[in-house]
């Protein structure tokens, strides 16, 4: 690589980092079992307009964006510094929300759904056309989870959207189990952090 190309690449990276870190991140504390409806509604509105909200799940904190909005999903990759070919997981808040985002639910998958959802189990399905390629990393399949955490379920339900959400940390860093961990990596890069205390499991879903 020539010096000119190297300098241009470095400048592009710096501009991307600066562009990603220009907002004030809102921090809201929520009761992990009975989250305040007004705070949840605030987070849901951010998601609807294409913003990013970090929220607790039973496993780790997730970084959520509108899973049907390609630009919002690209924002997740940018905030985390995550390779765009590394697929995201779509989160739903009830079983009926699965059918619109997948082409089919095999009988074997339905048995697992009946046994383990809601909970820390991520499943892979053939994706429906409505799911953007930015979610799946260009694959024909999509990962879906139905979390059991009250804050996560309330946020998804209030937004009326499948929420694309990897762990809410900088790529390559440990997965966050507290809001303070999220803030350390992503403060200024995302719109909101919902602080629901420590994640129960502390490990990402299967």
Predicted regions located by residue number:
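Residue-level detector of structural "landmarks"
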Residues: 1-4
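Intrinsic disorder/low-complexity segments in short proteins, especially the signal peptide
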Residues: 8-10
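Short hydrophobic alpha-helical segments enriched in small aliphatic residues
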Residues: 12-15
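Active-site-adjacent structural elements in enzyme catalytic cores
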Residues: 20-206
């Amino acid at each position: 690589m020539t010096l000119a190309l190297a300098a241009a690449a470095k400048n592009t990276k710096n501009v991307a980092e600066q562009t990603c870190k220009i907002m004030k991140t809102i921090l809201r504390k929520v009761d992990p079992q009975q989250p305040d409806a007004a705070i949840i509604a605030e987070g849901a509105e951010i998601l609807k307009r294409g913003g990013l909200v970090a929220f607790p799940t039973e496993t780790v904190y997730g970084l959520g964006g509108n899973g049907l909005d390609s630009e919002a999903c690209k924002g997740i990759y940018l905030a985390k510094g995550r390779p765009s070919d590394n697929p995201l997981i779509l989160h739903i808040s009830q079983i009926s929300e699965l059918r619109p985002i997948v082409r089919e639910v095999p009988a074997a998958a339905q048995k697992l759904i009946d046994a383990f959802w809601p909970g820390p189990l991520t499943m892979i399905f053939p994706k429906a056309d409505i799911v953007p390629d930015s979610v799946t990393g260009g694959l024909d399949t999509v990962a879906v989870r139905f979390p059991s955490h009250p804050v996560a379920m309330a946020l998804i339900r209030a937004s009326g959207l499948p929420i694309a959400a990897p762990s809410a940390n900088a790529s390559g860093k440990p997965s966050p189990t507290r809001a303070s961990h999220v803030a350390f990596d992503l403060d200024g890069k995302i719109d909101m952090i919902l602080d629901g205390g420590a994640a129960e499991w502390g490990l990402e879903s299967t």
